[in-house]
Structure formats: structure tokens, C-alpha cells
């Protein structure tokens, strides 16, 4: 077995299982080190016992490399594959089978843990036809939000990758902060160049309900906004975080009127919106995007978690934009932009 493939697969499965970042990083670092060695060097180092003298290779990763080069599936990988056979959820499989893409993922250009190429390649490998790269906007400095200049650089990187990846498409996008007044945290000219714009609240989450409603309605009514991300901002694990307060019926009605999709965020610590609000968004006639908000390749597998919640709450599959082809998705967003 190729040792790089073994190390990367272990990292993917650890991410899927919500392992600590430091554990995942050890395997991705080791994969990069081994991938950079000259032909035959890894075999030589296994033979003479010098593998662990390489920076970035420890006892655990050295063992995986040795087993892989010996022609075996590493024991640690076998164990993780066995654990991954258990489904993440008890439902959601029917909708998950219809999905073609994911509108919300991050790279190490902002607060993600992996390069753009790794995220795109992982999306391909799990069967997606397309995925949208949505790194953060400038104001979210804690997440290394992209300045206009860095976003322009990223567009060029994505264009280069797409030349090599066809027919898979990595679509350009952003997770754009909704500012206090409901305006969007990026230059309009740049937003017009993007394929998909996810808009999210990341600040003043405890704003007065009336003000938060005005803020969100203004944002989702903007023709440059395509998806409303994690609408309540809640966190349901760890120390947790309460939901932002707003008039959900008014916000979802505005989404339906503007053709802006409500995100069903699949991250286990978010599960946003809550079921009671998700059902109200269905009643409002809104579109939906079942997204992972992935910050690492293995987290792309979490989409079934959102699919289960969508099925439980009666979300019609035809109103889920992540079931659409890339062409249909882009027609939708371009038609929205034409009203700008």
C-alpha cells in the first residue's frame, strides 16, 4: 500500500471521527514528508531504522509507513476503517444519495486545517460533482479572513485547479460576515465575481431580537447573498452557546422571497437551525443547502448528519440546492446577481 495514501486516509478518518487536531496533523505532516522523499528513500530508511530521524515522523506514523511499504494495510488504518463502518446517523441516507455538492467549506487560507487542493480532492473522492470554497471575509480576523487582495489571489488558484480537475468543479465563494447593519463584509465587485456567497452572523450574536431580525433580513434580501449560514449561531457541545434571538418567520419569509437558501449546517456542534426552526423554514417555502462547514477533509463526510435532520423535518429534496448540478446552481446564483 502506498504510505502517503495510508497516512492521508488515517487523517481523513480521524477528522471524520472528530479527533483532536494535533492527532490529525501528525498524520498529514508525515504524509507530506514521505511524499517529498526521493524514490526509494523511504524504503531505505525503513531498512536502516532512520525513518524517525526525519522531522515530522514519529513512532506511530513510522509504524504506518513501515507496514504500508511492507505490502500490508497498516493495522491502525484497519482499526479506523472498522470503526467507520458504523454509520454517523440512523437516517439521512436517501437525501445524501441525491447530493451533488457542498456549499460551505474552508481551507487553510482562513481557519481551515488543510490546503485548498486537499479539500477539493477530498470532495471529489467522496463523490461530489462540485464543492464551494467559502473562506472567511476580512472582518473575521481571528479566522484569518481574506482581504480583497487575498481573495483575488485565491480566485486564480481555484481557476488553475479547475483546469486540472474537470469535470469536477471547485466553485468560488466566501463565507461573508453580515455586518451590524445587514450589509456584507466584502467589496461588491468581488462578490459579483464569486459563484456562491454564504452570509453568516459571527459578531454581536446577542443583539436585540428586533435589531437582529432587521440585520438578517437586510442580508438575505441582498441579491449577492445566496445562502444564509448557521442562522442561530448556536453551539450545542462543550460550553455551548445560546441561539441568537430573531423573528424566524420574518427572516425565512425574506429568504423565500429573495430565493436565498437556508443552510442546514451539519457540524455536530452546531446542528443549525434547530428542528423547530427548520420546520418553519419549510413552511415559509425557502430553499435549503445541506452543508458541512468543513474545516478539514474528513469533515466532508458529516453531510449525512444534516440530511437526517432535513428528512426528519420534511425538507423537500427538490428545494435542496446541494442536490442540483453545478450548471443549475450557477444559473440560480447568476439570476440573483442580475437583480443587484
How would you label these PLM feature ranges?
Residues 74, 79-98, 116-121, 127, ...:
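Charged catalytic cores and adjacent phosphate/nucleic-acid-binding surfaces used
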Residues 33-34, 124-126:
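Short, flexible N-terminal segments of the mature chain
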Residues 103-109, 130-134:
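Ser/Thr-glycine-rich phosphate-binding loops at phosphate-binding pockets of nucleotides
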Residues 132-133, 174-176:
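Core AdoMet radical
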Residues 1-93:
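Long, highly charged, low-complexity intrinsically disordered interaction regions
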